[in-house]
Structure formats: C-alpha cells, structure tokens
Amino acid sequence: MMMEVKAIHKGARISAQKTRLVADQIRGLPIARALNILNFSPKKAAFIVKKVVESAVANAEHNKGADIDELKVSAIIVDKGTSLKRFTARAKGRGNQIEKQTCHISVTLSN
C-alpha cells in the first residue's frame, strides 16, 4: 500500500535559491540518510529543511502509524514566497530598496 505524507513550511526567511541547494541533496533518499546529511550540513537552509522533514516524519508516525525505516523523501519542492521590502539609507539623502526573500518548503514522504 502506497502512503504519502506531507509537511509544509510557508514563509521561511531564506531565499528559495539557497534552499534548493540543500533540497537537491536529499531528494529521493531514505529518511535516516537525509537527516544525517542535514545534521552535518553547515548551511542555514539545512536547519530549516531538517525541521520540515522531521515534521513530516512525525505526521507519518502520528496520523498514519507508518514505520519510519521504510520512508523516503519522495518529493521536496521549494517555491518562492513573498518578499519583505525594506529600505536602506544611501548618500545624499537617497534610499535604496532591499528585498528580504522568503520561500515555501513542501516535503512529501512515501514508502
């Protein structure tokens, strides 16, 4: 019986481009291996993605009663979120706009 479990984190305060670098490393891997890679990755995105994967594992355990050892990351999608617009002061009384990027991380686990 094929089972799919999802976990979504919306509005993560990191750019989608940086998060996709981490997501590409764990796509298709078993849960134990994926969490091991995320634990030892120095990137900020790895910490955020790890939280989402752990949430998906908890969903599988609690909602579906799944065996964790059989699960793998079947899909991980990183979409661009809304940009927070901020201004920074420049010379001669001017200002420049800075966009603080956000992203939506969606993790799907299956057995």
Curated annotation (Swiss-Prot):
Annotated GO CC locations: cytosolic large ribosomal subunit
Pfam families named in the record: Ribosomal_L22
Stored InterPro entries: Ribosomal_uL22, Ribosomal_uL22_bac/chlpt-type, Ribosomal_uL22_bac/org-type, Ribosomal_uL22_CS, Ribosomal_uL22_sf
GO function terms (MF aspect): rRNA binding; structural constituent of ribosome
SUPFAM superfamilies (UniProt xref): Ribosomal protein L22
Entry's Gene Ontology BP terms: translation
Keyword set, alphabetical order: Ribonucleoprotein, Ribosomal protein, RNA-binding, rRNA-binding
NCBIfam families: rplV_bact
Family: Belongs to the universal ribosomal protein uL22 family.
Function: This protein binds specifically to 23S rRNA; its binding is stimulated by other ribosomal proteins, e.g. L4, L17, and L20. It is important during the early stages of 50S assembly. It makes multiple contacts with different domains of the 23S rRNA in the assembled 50S subunit and ribosome. The globular domain of the protein is located near the polypeptide exit tunnel on the outside of the subunit, while an extended beta-hairpin is found that lines the wall of the exit tunnel in the center of the 70S ribosome.
Subunit organization: Part of the 50S ribosomal subunit.
Protein name: Large ribosomal subunit protein uL22
Gene: rplV
